[in-house]
């Protein structure tokens, strides 16, 4: 199985024998207690691979792959329990989808849950019976994932919410509606949803919906323009004369002077690559793969793509390193990094990374909105 851009076996080849044995144990057992240990072992795994100089995006791909395995085992366990309780098998085929960073294969250490169900179509007359069954499954799945170490989503982006639990036809209608009746809330729902990936069940349901998303967004200039404008809150943290724009106390208590390397680092680049791929009708999720596809099509110049790849890798490296340090020191694991924790070379590279992202977004502003910066 591929873990992002790197074959899983190749990834494991750089780990010590102890870690390889630990990883092998990930395939053993599927109860909540065992999977909790699997989740906890991810920090040790990430730290060792980091020390072995594996690039951060490839560590993220491996962490995401492990999280998908956790999803599969949790769903298998929930289905077995429901069958044992006399609730029967699933009334229709379905796919469990994971969204956000998990859908892109770019999870850091402690992502929360972003999941949903795509159900095969069924008669409206059967809705109450079938939906009740999937509500039960969704409650079991999200409860167990939370117990294991994948926290409940504070924004309720979970299969327990009917907004994220629909038949394939309902999902297609929802996407078409979002593309026509635009607004801040709907645009942000699109941002969450458009990176979905099938984690369990009928992959073809997710593939069908992915094609519909690509067909709906491609050429829909007003929709893409409004998505770009809504993403403007997440800009690279670089100001005049190449100075970092750090956080205020009002942004996050106790983190004044820090950089939020997710909201002002990886996120602006992730959003830009997603938007360009939507415009081109490309059904690709991982950010680096999106960059490569856009370069292959001539949308990104070779040098520009090279700068952006370097930016993504460097920011991800700094963020993952900080999360590992915070966890090991018993501090809350966040997306915040203080500039003083960086070497001069790292800080210079980060400024160059932010500048590359800003240049891209300035160019996209002209393309998507027609606005030219003075």
Language-model segments: residues:
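Short beta->alpha transition motifs characteristic of CBS
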Residues: 2-18
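A nucleotide- and high-energy phosphate-metabolite-utilizing enzyme signature
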Residues: 18-374
């Amino acid at each position: 199985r591929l873990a992002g851009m790197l074959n899983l076996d190749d990834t494991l080849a750089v780990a010590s024998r102890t870690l390889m044995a630990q990883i092998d144990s990930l395939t053993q057992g599927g109860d909540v207690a065992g999977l909790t240990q699997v989740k906890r072992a991810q920090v040790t795994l990430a730290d060792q691979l980091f020390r072995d100089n594996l690039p951060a995006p490839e560590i993220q791909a491996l962490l995401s792959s492990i999280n998908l395995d956790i999803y599969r085992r949790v769903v298998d366990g929930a289905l077995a329990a429901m069958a044992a309780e006399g609730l029967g098998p699933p009334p229709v085929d379905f796919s469990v989808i994971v969204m956000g960073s998990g859908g892109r294969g770019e999870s850091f250490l402690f992502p929360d849950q972003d999941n949903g169900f795509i159900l095969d179509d069924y008669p409206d007359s059967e809705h109450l019976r079938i939906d009740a069954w999937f509500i039960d499954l969704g409650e079991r799945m999200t409860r167990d994932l939370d117990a294991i170490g994948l926290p409940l989503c504070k924004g309720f982006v979970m299969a327990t919410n009917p907004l994220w639990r629909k038949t394939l036809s309902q999902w297609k209608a929802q996407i078409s509606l979002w593309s026509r009746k635009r607004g801040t809330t709907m645009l942000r729902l699109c941002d969450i949803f458009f990176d979905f990936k099938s984690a369990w069940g009928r992959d073809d349901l997710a593939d069908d919906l992915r094609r519909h998303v690509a067909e709906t967004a491609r050429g829909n200039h007003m929709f893409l323009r409004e998505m770009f404008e809504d993403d403007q809150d997440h800009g690279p943290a670089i100001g005049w004369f190449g100075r970092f724009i750090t956080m205020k106390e009002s942004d996050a208590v106790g983190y004044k002077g820090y950089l939020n390397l997710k909201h002002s680092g990886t996120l602006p680049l992730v959003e830009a690559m997603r938007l360009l791929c939507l415009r081109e009708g490309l059904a690709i999720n991982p950010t680096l793969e999106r960059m490569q596809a856009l370069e292959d099509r001539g949308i990104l110049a070779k040098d520009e793509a090279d700068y952006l790849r370097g930016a993504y890798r460097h920011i991800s490296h700094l963020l993952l390193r900080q999360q590992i340090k915070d966890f090991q020191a018993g501090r809350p694991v966040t997306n915040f990094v203080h500039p003083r924790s960086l070497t001069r070379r790292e800080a210079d590279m980060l400024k160059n990374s932010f500048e590359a992202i800003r240049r891209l977004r300035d160019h996209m502003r002209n393309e998507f909105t027609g606005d030219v910066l003075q």
